[in-house]
């Protein structure tokens, strides 16, 4: 017979202790959360009969016609210097062809699987031809790829195409729309039959008219894992996930399994609410190795968008920045505190200061912007002048020494400095400094970030 002391010695010597059901529940939730958030986002975004500027039936593109404002609630932390084009696809019955024009500006396509991993990045400015076509298929596709079309395999049946096209100002929107009009999507069968113009109608369900993250947060434990298990069946995990999938199967979470919240007893829903309320904080703690810190700023570094088995990191991003790019395309330094370590507050006034020659370094067609968000919900803040960011195209006034000051406050500064004003209104807010197509010094965290000083 093994004594308790001996068992303790075994654990201390590296024999792993068996996980409790509560620990497995956390692992299962973290593993499946991006999949469930993606599914909710897809349901909301395809909940329409015909194409609009915010929704389209499955496998069809829809294009935002304007930059995001405070009314935009579909995706957290929306950027306000690119216009989105999107397509939520389902490859379970047929492949999907995406048709794109060559551009002379930043117009980058991020293709994600159902777990929100970026499986392909397409830069339209790099095209050799005026039009390029891409065929998206499941990994087990055995059909023919038409000549002149590039095949991209997706490990899951469902996925998300997110296209960001830079828009310099309100007058530039007409040029962005001209680019959007040259984009198209249609099934492989439609292409082969020469019937690419037909766009099947979708279905509207009033029950799918929700804010995705809030919808997921409102699910019961049973409803959540019923949905997760079905999604795992439709979008099977990869071989890299085998260890985790085998582990969480012990509480019947996995493809073709039947979950029963009764295994957690009468306190199941209390446990679930506690988990829902703490998961973002726990995932952030687990992801510190990927957090790059520089001055009062920090940003999500690699492997963002190319998560591999960094499940807690992937879950965190699904809550705070769904659809984020890999660092090769963009980095997003975030500031919640000023340079003295004090929490940013809407009742204070701040100066964000770039030294001369220390504006964010970017590659050709790259750009940068500073955007403010309400920390209570990660959305833009309403303001009287409808200004949500300052960017490298803004009409700002530089200091005599060539440095740049951005004034972050609720009330406007002096008239001559209003072009440098970024309005804020929330009790607590944070800033995101987006840098698209960053130079290597940014990716390597060697570029000096701007200071944020209280006035």
Regions found by a protein language model. Give the residues of each.
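C-terminal motif of bacterial Sec signal peptides marking the signal peptidase cleavage site
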Residues: 10-12
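A compositional/structural signature for long, glycine/proline-rich flexible linkers
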Residues: 15-455
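Sec-dependent N-terminal signal peptides
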Residues: 1-7
